[in-house]
């Protein structure tokens, strides 16, 4: 789970953040402002300061926020002077936008606010539809509203060119004031409340936010055009309400609730993709007539509320179809406010002790949770206090008395112990008023939502005889600490508290004064702390809109050891998990060596049993190879025997019945090349391949009744195959990695003769074993760095382990295995045909496709009948319309065409008689494997530099390039064998979004844009990892490229039609090459290795018995003088979707024949 932030404001207006992986509240970097309340999203936070102005805090990121400004220069031809700026009176402006309706001179385009800066000056865009234009960037047409082309024709009477300029948002990690322009709609009064949400509105474009605000006059305002490229938005618009609003809350989806002065709640209805502001309000009555609602918080499927008597309420039956819900349920506890974050997790601030509480037990099946638990972590400034007290460990009375004192008490609860540890210490710096209040509160108790108890500090008991003042410690939400007034004395809007005075810094009685103790009363930069060193902060507001906490996740906010002082706690925390893991590994290594020494003395004894046999039997289903092709019940037996030399081998027997005659089929597991799970909605099945069955494209398919049974058999058979081939442990540095269309990861160890020119090993004899995890793309390097990308664009890095998933605990490493999740979408299509009576309906012709089908129209797929890809996946969303399909859509998501097998477009014409609409639904898989997440940027492609075995690059960092899901090109810094995840991203500017990137062995970087154009990055080197500029490379004629792969000297590219192209003419003096040469068709993915070897995933391969889709293929005959090769060698398939051979730098033995010697030396880096 990636780290995220919980935001909070204390009573003094200071903004703090708490990481889900942290144990301290960190003060916001910009401390000049004091805030009343904040509302957070994933990448930003909005707030209302004490000056009643709205501010925006955008978190820093390696990827900048860039916005492209465009202007078009228009010219018309005349017989006197040719093309000039003199236009006809009916023409558009000489400088305009793309439509020509708006005047847009270059000097008239200004920055929207002081928080933006220009990246460069205006320059001409010489890219037109993926093809480079002539010098000057002009495109020509017969008239302005016509279609433009790159080439000038005899009837080209007008021309235009596009000027572009990028601006960058520079206000990161600081509060930026939202500008208020002088216009008639300027705010009449200051803001009182603000809420951010709506980033997951169904069908909403990624990055859009909904910002709602309430003024002191009770009016509701909406911020227009807030999105990731435009974080400030454009303007405020007034939203009519039936009454005066006090407070408003916007959930991540389409829930918006507000509270009225009269105590009722307002619910906004009609929110959708095309209308994020909604269209009407509905009134919801409060739980009781005596106490109205004063605070609400909306989530994804929940709404929580606080009434005027501080009671907490949960709204039942809330969802997108019924935003008003059904009824109120009273919850335990009294809060001043609550906030619902991501995944419907809830935080609140207690009205008694002003502490932040987290609602535990919130799950999709139990949205109300189970209990409140206090967050007991301290502030980051408290680290020096707890750390300096560690020097007192040498004082015997301190450590001994504390242990004796703690032993006389009963074990406290987690919350009590955490609060007690947080407030203990060898020196008290509480103000005198606070100590007096503590004495007055001694022995008192109040009614609350959780059981509380009073405990005394054992440290103070030990030092009471020395004259140290004893202050009883209180904990729990029902006790008040420090100068906090009672709830009745707290104003709702204006909080004006005086800072408590500091107590004099004197050393504790009985302890020598040390530098560590004296530092407890000092604060950095002369800044006074509003709390004592042992006080917990008093909170006024909390926001979890950007805090992602999954149900059941272990947080460090509550796990503080009970009965230990801060000094002992600091000591225990100083032992890092890495040190603990190293200590365990050392013990394991010593035990292993001892076992070897003890067994060495008995090796000369003869074995008592020369040969052993082990058999496992079970019942499975087998897909019959002959008619009628169907699943039949069979008995299977795995017989494993150990030979005289200790080698193990296994045979799998499949017993079946044909026409009442018993027969069997046997497979030697040392001949099995791969065991692969099969994507099946209704069966837990897997396939077994041998070299012969790989050539036939007809594997042995088996199915189990349960997923656990299938995993058991799959694990056992895979382990037996690995033992037969003596393959164990983590993959080698030269391993070949691949991914199936199901997301399963497979790895193969290359033999020395795999890339030999003579007597090479056929691909169908390669042995593949499965690794735990789930990925869509994988990329490897010969120095052991392996990265992968999931279906949800999450980046993962290989940890060095092996196994995981179904192999956990049996054929898996004990360390470096972590939980991994992935999310993908399932798509179905709604088809309709037009008729003159009723228009478009779901009644088609008898020859038409199904009205609910897949993308091909050949298979019927309804909403109710469509299931997740396999039983391992679970639905995590409802069906929604997908507006991002190729060709565009109208406002309702429809695409139109003349007939179903034709091309679709997003607008209706007179000849369009059919239409379709794409529906999507997300599903999630949770597994485990040797992978760690690389946060926080989502990626769509990644490339690691391939290095040959004799390359002298061990001293340099490993070059890694990637493309984000938004199309940004990134370069990863700090990647090495010891740190495969790297340290940070370096953004590489582009003029358009990219789709693919690849770096070669000599730091030659090639990339493909989303419009199909190719680019080469110049001057990339270890000292200049990002290079200097992009060179536009013309694509193959009438083709749009989708992927590129670069080896040592070879560059291969793939177009959208499955054609494979080779870039010819690449030399050290001209690394861009001269032309594209066609190599093959029927290709889905390509991977070029450090030896310029070429491997692909073929779309279709015909075998002797069947057809396979997605087959691993190797290009044969690739040599320095024949870089394109001469044919294909077909390997494992089908169902494979990605392969990476960029780690395989294993050269063939040097028994070169005369023919090989005639080819001359190897390739030279460009």
Swiss-Prot record:
Gene3D superfamilies referenced in this protein's UniProt entry, alphabetically: Pleckstrin-homology domain (PH domain)/Phosphotyrosine-binding domain (PTB) (2.30.29.30)
Record-level GO BP terms: autophagosome maturation; autophagy; macroautophagy; regulation of autophagosome maturation
Placement of TECPR repeats on the sequence: 209-240, 254-285, 301-332, 344-376, 734-761, 958-989, 1003-1034, 1049-1080, 1092-1132
Modified residues (Phosphoserine): 386, 388, 391, 413, 418, 943
Compositionally biased spans, kind Polar residues: 407-418, 437-446
GO annotations of cellular component type: autophagosome membrane; cytoplasmic vesicle; lysosomal membrane; nucleoplasm
Stretches with biased composition (Basic and acidic residues): 420-436, 447-456
Residue ranges of the region described as Disordered: 403-492, 1147-1166
Compartments where found: Cytoplasmic vesicle, Autophagosome membrane; Lysosome membrane
Molecular function in Gene Ontology: phosphatidylinositol-3-phosphate binding
Listed Pfam families: Hyd_WA, Pex24p, Tectonin
Protein name as annotated: Tectonin beta-propeller repeat-containing protein 1
Source organism of this protein record: Rattus norvegicus
């Amino acid at each position: 789970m990636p780290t995220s932030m919980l935001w909070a404001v204390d009573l003094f207006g200071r903004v703090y953040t708490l990481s889900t992986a942290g144990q301290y509240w960190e003060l916001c970097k910009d401390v000049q402002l004091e805030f009343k309340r904040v509302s957070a999203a994933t990448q930003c936070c909005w707030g209302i300061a004490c000056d009643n102005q709205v501010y925006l805090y955008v978190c820093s990121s390696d990827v900048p926020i860039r916005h492209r400004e465009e202007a078009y220069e228009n010219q018309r031809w005349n017989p006197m002077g040719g093309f000039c700026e003199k236009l006809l009176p009916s023409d558009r402006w000489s400088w305009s936008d793309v439509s020509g309706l708006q005047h847009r001179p270059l000097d008239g385009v200004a920055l929207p606010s002081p928080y933006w800066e220009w990246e460069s000056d205006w320059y001409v865009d010489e890219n037109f539809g993926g093809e480079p234009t002539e010098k000057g960037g002009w495109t020509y047409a017969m008239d302005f509203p016509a279609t433009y082309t790159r080439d000038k024709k005899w009837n080209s009477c007008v021309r235009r060119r596009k000027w572009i300029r990028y601006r960058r948002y520079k206000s990161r990690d600081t509060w930026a004031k939202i500008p208020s322009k002088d216009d008639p709609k300027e705010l009449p009064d200051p803001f009182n409340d603000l809420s951010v949400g709506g980033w997951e509105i169904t069908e909403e474009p990624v990055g859009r936010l909904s910002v709602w605000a309430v003024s002191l006059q009770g009016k509701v305002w909406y911020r227009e055009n807030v999105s990731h490229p435009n974080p400030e938005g454009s303007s405020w618009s007034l939203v009519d309400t039936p009454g005066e609003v006090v407070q408003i809350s916007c959930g991540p989806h389409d829930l918006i609730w507000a509270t009225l002065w009269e105590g009722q709640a307002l619910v906004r209805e009609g929110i959708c993709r095309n209308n994020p502001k909604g269209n009407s309000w509905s009134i919801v009555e409060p739980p009781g007539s005596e106490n109205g609602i004063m605070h609400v918080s909306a989530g994804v499927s929940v709404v929580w509320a606080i009434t005027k008597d501080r009671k907490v309420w949960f709204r039942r039956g809330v969802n997108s179809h019924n935003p008003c819900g059904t009824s109120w349920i009273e919850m335990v506890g009294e809060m001043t406010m609550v906030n619902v974050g991501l995944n419907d997790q809830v935080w609140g601030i207690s009205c008694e002790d002003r502490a932040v509480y987290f609602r535990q037990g919130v799950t999709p099946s139990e949205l109300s949770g189970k209990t409140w638990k206090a967050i007991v972590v301290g502030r980051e400034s408290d680290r020096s206090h707890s750390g300096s007290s560690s020097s007192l460990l040498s004082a015997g009375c301190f450590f001994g008395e504390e242990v004796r004192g703690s032993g006389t008490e009963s074990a406290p609860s987690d919350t009590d112990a955490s609060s007690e540890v947080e407030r203990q210490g060898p020196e008290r710096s509480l103000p005198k008023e606070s100590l007096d209040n503590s004495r007055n509160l001694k022995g008192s108790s109040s009614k609350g939502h959780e059981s509380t108890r009073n405990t005394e500090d054992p440290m103070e008991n030990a030092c009471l005889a020395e004259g140290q003042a004893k202050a009883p410690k209180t904990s729990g939400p029902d006790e008040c600490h420090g100068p906090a007034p009672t709830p009745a004395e707290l104003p709702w809007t204006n909080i004006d508290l005086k800072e408590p005075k500091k107590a004099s810094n004197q050393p504790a009685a009985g302890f020598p004064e040390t530098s560590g103790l004296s530092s407890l009363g000092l604060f950095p930069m002369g800044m006074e702390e509003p709390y004592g060193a042992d006080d917990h902060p008093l909170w006024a507001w909390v926001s979890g809109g950007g805090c992602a906490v999954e149900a059941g996740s272990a947080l460090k906010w509550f796990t503080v050891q009970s009965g230990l002082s801060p000094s002992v706690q600091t000591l225990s925390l100083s032992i890092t998990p890495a040190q603990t893991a190293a200590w365990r590994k050392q013990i394991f290594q010593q035990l292993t060596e001892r076992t070897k020494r003890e067994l060495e003395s008995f090796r000369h004894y003869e074995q008592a049993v020369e040969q052993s046999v082990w058999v496992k039997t079970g019942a499975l289903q087998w897909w019959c190879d002959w008619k009628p092709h169907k699943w039949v019940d069979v008995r299977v037996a795995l017989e494993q025997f150990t030979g005289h030399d200790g080698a193990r081998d296994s045979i799998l027997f499949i017993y079946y019945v044909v026409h009442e005659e018993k027969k069997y089929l046997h497979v030697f597991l040392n001949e099995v090349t791969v065991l692969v799970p099969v994507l099946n909605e209704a069966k837990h099945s897997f396939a077994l391949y041998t070299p012969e069955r790989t050539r036939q494209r007809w594997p042995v398919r088996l199915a189990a009744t349960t997923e656990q049974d299938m995993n058991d058999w799959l694990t056992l058979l895979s382990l037996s195959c690995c033992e037969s081939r003596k393959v164990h442990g983590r993959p080698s540095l030269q391993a070949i990695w691949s991914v199936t269309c199901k997301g399963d990861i497979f790895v193969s160890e290359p033999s020395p003769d795999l890339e030999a020119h003579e007597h090479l090993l056929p691909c169908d004899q390669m042995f593949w074993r499965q690794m735990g995890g789930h990925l869509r793309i994988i990329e490897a390097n010969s120095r052991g760095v392996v990265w992968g990308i999931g279906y949800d664009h999450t980046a993962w890095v290989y940890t060095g382990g092996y196994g995981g998933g179904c192999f956990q605990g049996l054929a898996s490493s004990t360390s470096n295995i972590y939980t991994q999740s992935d999310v993908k979408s399932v798509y179905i299509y709604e088809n309709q045909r037009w008729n003159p009576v009723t228009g478009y309906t779901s009644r088609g012709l008898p020859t038409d496709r199904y009205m609910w089908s897949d993308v091909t129209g050949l298979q019927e797929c309804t909403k109710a009948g469509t299931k997740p890809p396999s039983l391992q996946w679970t639905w995590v969303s409802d069906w929604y319309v997908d507006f991002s399909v190729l060709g565009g859509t109208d406002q309702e998501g429809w695409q139109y065409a003349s007939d179903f097998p034709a091309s679709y477009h997003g607008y209706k014409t007179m000849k369009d008689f059919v239409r379709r609409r794409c529906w999507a639904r997300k599903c999630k898989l949770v597994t485990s494997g040797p992978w760690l997440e690389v946060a926080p940027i989502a990626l769509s492609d990644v490339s690691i530099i391939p290095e040959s075995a004799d390359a002298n690059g061990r001293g340099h960092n490993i070059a890694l390039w990637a493309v984000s899901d938004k199309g940004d090109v990134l370069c990863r810094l700090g990647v090495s064998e010891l740190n495969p995840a790297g340290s940070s991203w370096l953004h590489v500017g582009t003029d358009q979004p990219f789709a693919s990137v690849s770096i070669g062995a000599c730091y030659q970087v090639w990339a493909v844009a989303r419009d199909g154009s190719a680019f080469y990055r110049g001057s990339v080197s270890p000292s200049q990892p990002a290079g200097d500029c992009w060179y536009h490379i013309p694509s193959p004629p009438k083709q749009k490229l989708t992927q590129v792969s670069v080896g040592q000297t070879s560059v291969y590219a793939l177009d959208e039609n499955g054609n494979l192209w080779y870039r010819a003419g690449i030399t050290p003096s001209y690394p861009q090459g001269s032309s594209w040469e066609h190599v093959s068709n029927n290709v889905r993915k390509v991977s070029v290795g450090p030896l310029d070897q070429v491997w692909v995933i073929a779309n279709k391969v015909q075998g002797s018995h069947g057809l396979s889709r997605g087959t691993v293929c190797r290009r044969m005959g690739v040599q320095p003088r024949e870089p394109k090769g001469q044919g294909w060698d077909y390997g494992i398939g089908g169902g494979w979707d990605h392969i990476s051979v960029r780690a395989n730098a294993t050269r063939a033995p040097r028994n070169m024949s005369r023919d090989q010697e005639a080819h001359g030396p190897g390739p030279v880096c460009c």
